Curated annotation (Swiss-Prot):
It comes from Shigella flexneri. Its main location: membrane. The gene is metN. This is Methionine import ATP-binding protein MetN. The keyword Transcription does not apply. NCBIfam families: ABC_MetN. InterPro entries: AAA+_ATPase (IPR003593), ABC_MetN_proteobac (IPR012692), ABC_transporter-like_ATP-bd (IPR003439), ABC_transporter-like_CS (IPR017871), ACT-like_dom_sf (IPR045865), MetN_ABC (IPR041701), MetN_ABC_transporter-like (IPR050086), NIL_domain (IPR018449). The complex is composed of two ATP-binding proteins (MetN), two transmembrane proteins (MetI) and a solute-binding protein (MetQ). Belongs to the ABC transporter superfamily. Methionine importer (TC 3.A.1.24) family.
Length: 343
């Protein structure tokens, strides 16, 4: 549905030359929810704006539904963009128009008959859960409701693709979840292809089928969500995954934790499990093999793309030789082990 080939984008600011994208290629199949994650300034907004040519690539080709956009005339491009809806971090609603009027706007600009506009807008507002808000104005809506209006407006022309530019980053966590569930439902009902960009791995984890990691204008890692969470290949992907798990050292342990070993101490470990290592009974196996005992302090597990992953804080009791052997064995079995200190 979306095929980007060798996309490069260069900006010129006075005497400065900024390369925002460098030889980016990616294919997003029809009906898929595809996420692009990266830090601020990584190039993700430039990338998504190249899909509908809000930013025209310096080099490369953009195919959407088999049509090469970079060679179209302005009138042809305007027509092609009707098949590409887009929502943003800021909702860009017209304050002087009602909810109905905002959703109806693209249909009015396309000279759609009034009866058809009424039918289509009513259908869309029901789809996004705002069937009772036809006559409300944006000033009377919550942030989540405003984004729902923006989604309905983006779908008014019955597009095949929906682009989401940090669409939930201005929303609170509960509202973010509801908007993501709405996007997932729309994808399922309409078979809509969704390309979203975000700096939050929680967004990717919740609804995406595949994900690409962008850094300094390049896609440095890309795969299914389950594969990236199970076997992240780059430090940046690992960092984003770690950001979805929050496990603090309890206060009483913080007070006792030492950076260097001391008499009768035990190491405190941070264990990171992904993929097959989550389900395997590795801690009980270390106890059996190496005569160590693990005192679990706290743990957190989660799912992404049907795959479990998680982290655990534990004290490992045993001789120095046995604990070192147990740690090495865990690492051999794809558990990331960090010695936080000694207690």
């Amino acid at each position: 549905m979306i095929k980007l080939s060798n996309i490069t984008k260069v900006f010129h600011q006075g005497t400065r030359t900024i390369q925002a994208l460098n030889n980016v290629s990616r294919h997003v199949p029809a009906g898929q929810i595809y996420g692009v994650i990266g830090a601020s300034g990584a190039g993700k907004s430039t990338l998504i704006r190249c899909v509908n040519l809000l930013e025209r690539p310096t080099e490369g080709s953009v195919l959407v539904d088999g049509q090469e956009l970079t060679t179209l005339s302005e009138s042809e491009l305007t027509k092609a963009r009707r098949q590409i809806g887009m929502i943003f971090q800021h909702f860009n609603l017209l304050s002087s128009r009602t909810v109905f009027g905002n959703v109806a706007l693209p249909l009015e600009l396309d000279n759609t008959p009034k009866d058809e506009i009424k039918r289509r807008v009513t259908e869309l507002l029901s789809l996004v859960g705002l069937g009772d808000k036809h006559d409300s104005y944006p000033s009377n809506l919550s942030g989540g409701q405003k984004q729902r209006v923006a989604i309905a407006r983006a779908l008014a022309s019955n597009p095949k693709v929906l682009l989401c530019d940090e669409a939930t980053s201005a929303l609170d966590p509960a509202t973010t979840r509801s908007i993501l569930e709405l996007l997932k439902d729309i994808n399922r009902r309409l078979g809509l292809t969704i390309l979203l960009i975000t700096h939050e791995m929680d967004v990717v984890k919740r609804i995406c089928d595949c994900v690409a990691v962008i850094s300094n204008g390049e896609l440095i890692e890309q795969d299914t969500v389950s594969e990236v969470f199970s076997h992240p290949k780059t430090p940046l992907a690992q960092k984003f995954i770690q950001s979805t798990l929050h496990l603090d050292i309890p206060e009483d342990y913080q007070e006792r934790l030492q950076t260097e070993p001391f008499t009768d101490c035990v190491p405190m470990l941070r264990l990171e499990f992904t993929g097959q290592s989550v389900d395997a009974p590795l801690l009980s196996e270390t106890a059996r093999r190496f005569n160590v005992n693990n005192n679990i302090i706290s743990a957190q597990m989660d799912y992404a793309g049907g795959v479990k992953f998680g982290i655990m804080l534990t004290e490992m009791h045993g001789t120095q030789q046995d604990t070192q052997a147990a740690i090495a064995w865990l690492q051999e079995h794809h558990v990331k082990v960090e010695v936080l200190g000694y207690v």
